Amino acid sequence: MSANKVEAVLIDEETLDLHELASACAVPPTWVVERVEAGLLACDSAAGEMRFASAHLVRARRMVTTERCFDANQEVAALVADLIEEVEQLRRQVHAAAKRSRG
């Protein structure tokens, strides 16, 4: 695991364009376009321009890390991102249920 840990604040109202997302992930824009076209990374298209929410940035970074660290193909990287997102959702549900049972 890398000693360089990046912390980010998610701002749901802010979106990134294709080049901003690619730059934030340290990948070429073609990397992003390939994954969008394959249905592995979602985007919002307004007036023909790709826009990415903060959740898309988190997913893209996970996919980049998985591809680089484990020499995984894009489909495996997307599956790993799906599983991480599912675990996070389940943890939120367990936490919410625990709060309700205490209160």
Question: Where on the chain are the PLM-derived regions?
Answer:
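Arg/Lys-rich, alpha-helical DNA-contact motif
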Residues: 2-23, 29-33, 37-103
